[in-house]
C-alpha cells in the first residue's frame, strides 16, 4: 500500500526522507509498528491522516491482541476502533474490559476472526451464552479459553462449547459456580481426549463424580486445579492417580476431604501438589511454636 499524500506543513530539505516515505508493508509495518505498544499506537494515529491510515493498516493485520497493553482500563470506543478491521486474530485477551464488555461488543469481533486459537474473557460478567455460542460456532480451532469468574457460564453454555470445539486443550472455569458435576461429566466425555489443562477451582458444586469422569476420559491431562472444591475427596484423587499418567500438577488446597494416602501415589510420580505432606506441616508447626529452627531438619 502506498502512503497517502499528506501536506508536510513546511518545506522539506532536498534528499530528506520522512518516516512515512518508507515502504509501509515492507519496512514500517513489520519492523517498526510491530514493536510499538498499543497504547502508543492510539497516540500515533492522532498525529495526521497518514499516520492514522498506517496504524489502521497495522491493526488490520494483528495476530494477537491483549487489551492489557492499552492499560488497566480501556474505553468501549477505543476497543471498537482498535479491532474494527482485524480479521486474522489468533489470540484475544479482554480482561481489562470486564466491567462493560457485552455480547454486542464481542460477537462481531468473534465473527470476523474465525482463526482464533486463544481467548481470555476472565471476569467479563456482562456476557451471556450468546457470546459463548458465537465463539464455539465460529472458532473451530479454539485451543485455549479462560472464563474464570464468569458467573453466567452454566451447564447449557458448557455443553455447547464441548459440542463445537474439537481442538480445545486448555479451559479455565475458575469460580464458574453454576457448573455442577453433570456439566463437567459431559465436557469430559465429549472433549476429554484432548484436554491438557483444566481449572474448576472455587466451585463447591464439583465433587468426586466429575473428577472421576475427567480421570477416565482425559489421558493427556497435565494440570488440574480443584482449589476450594469442597465436595472433592480422596476417591476422586485416587482415580486421577490411576488413569492420568501425564498429570504434572494438581491443586487441592482447601479440599478438606482429600487425605494424604490418596496423594502419596501422585507424589511418588513427581506430580507437583500444592498441599505439603503431613510430616512437613507438623515440622513447620513445631518450628513456629517452639522456635526450634536451628534444630529441625525440614527435609526429613
Swiss-Prot record:
Residues 113-269 are annotated as: Interaction with SMURF1. Pathway: Protein modification; protein ubiquitination. It comes from the Eukaryota. Residues 19-66 form the F-box domain. Its main location: cytoplasm. GO terms for biological process: bone mineralization; dorsal/ventral pattern formation; G2/M transition of mitotic cell cycle; positive regulation of BMP signaling pathway; protein ubiquitination; SCF-dependent proteasomal ubiquitin-dependent protein catabolic process. Keywords: Acetylation, Cytoplasm, Leucine-rich repeat, Repeat, Ubl conjugation pathway. SUPFAM superfamilies: F-box domain, RNI-like. The keyword Cytoplasm applies. The modification N-acetylmethionine is found at residue 1. Pfam families: F-box (PF00646), LRR_6 (PF13516), LRR_At5g56370 (PF24758). One of its GO terms (cellular component) is SCF ubiquitin ligase complex. LRR repeats lie at residues 141-162, 167-188, 194-215, 220-241, 246-267. It is found in: Cytoplasm. InterPro entries: F-box-like_dom_sf, F-box_dom, F-box_LRR-repeat, Leu-rich_rpt, Leu-rich_rpt_Cys-con_subtyp, LRR_dom_sf, LRR_FXL15/At3g58940/PEG3-like. Substrate recognition component of a SCF (SKP1-CUL1-F-box protein) E3 ubiquitin-protein ligase complex which mediates the ubiquitination and subsequent proteasomal degradation of SMURF1, thereby acting as a positive regulator of the BMP signaling pathway. Required for dorsal/ventral pattern formation and bone mass maintenance. Also mediates ubiquitination of SMURF2 and WWP2. Part of the SCF (SKP1-CUL1-F-box) E3 ubiquitin-protein ligase complex SCF(FBXL15) composed of CUL1, SKP1, RBX1 and FBXL15. Belongs to the FBXL15 family. This is F-box/LRR-repeat protein 15.
Amino acid at each position: 500500500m502506498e502512503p497517502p499524500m499528506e501536506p508536510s506543513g513546511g518545506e522539506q530539505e532536498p534528499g530528506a526522507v520522512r518516516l512515512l516515505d518508507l515502504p509501509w508493508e515492507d519496512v514500517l509495518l513489520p519492523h517498526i509498528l510491530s514493536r510499538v505498544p498499543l497504547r502508543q499506537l492510539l497516540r500515533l494515529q492522532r498525529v495526521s491522516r497518514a499516520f492514522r491510515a498506517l496504524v489502521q493498516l497495522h491493526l488490520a493485520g494483528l495476530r494477537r491482541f491483549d487489551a492489557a497493553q492499552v492499560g488497566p482500563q480501556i474505553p468501549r470506543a477505543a476497543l471498537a476502533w482498535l479491532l474494527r478491521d482485524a480479521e486474522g486474530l489468533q489470540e484475544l485477551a479482554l480482561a481489562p474490559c470486564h466491567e462493560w464488555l457485552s455480547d454486542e461488543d464481542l460477537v462481531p469481533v468473534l465473527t470476523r476472526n474465525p482463526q482464533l486459537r486463544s481467548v481470555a474473557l476472565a471476569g467479563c460478567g456482562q456476557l451471556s451464552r450468546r457470546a459463548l455460542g458465537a465463539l464455539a460456532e465460529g472458532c473451530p480451532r479454539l485451543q485455549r479459553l479462560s472464563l474464570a469468574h464468569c458467573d453466567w457460564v452454566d451447564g447449557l453454555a458448557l455443553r455447547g462449547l464441548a459440542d463445537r470445539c474439537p481442538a480445545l486443550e486448555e479451559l479455565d472455569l475458575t469460580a464458574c459456580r453454576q457448573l455442577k458435576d453433570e456439566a463437567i461429566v459431559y465436557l469430559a466425555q465429549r472433549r476429554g481426549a484432548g484436554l491438557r489443562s483444566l481449572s474448576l477451582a472455587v466451585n463447591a458444586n464439583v465433587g468426586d463424580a466429575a473428577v472421576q469422569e475427567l480421570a477416565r476420559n482425559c489421558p493427556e491431562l497435565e494440570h488440574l486445579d480443584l482449589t476450594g472444591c469442597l465436595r472433592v475427596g480422596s476417591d476422586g484423587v485416587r482415580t486421577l492417580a490411576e488413569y492420568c499418567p501425564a498429570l504434572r500438577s494438581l491443586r487441592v488446597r482447601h479440599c478438606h476431604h482429600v487425605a494424604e494416602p490418596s496423594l502419596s501415589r501422585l507424589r511418588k510420580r513427581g506430580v507437583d501438589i500444592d498441599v505439603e505432606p503431613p510430616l512437613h506441616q507438623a515440622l513447620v508447626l513445631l518450628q513456629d511454636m517452639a522456635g526450634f529452627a536451628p534444630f529441625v531438619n525440614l527435609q526429613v
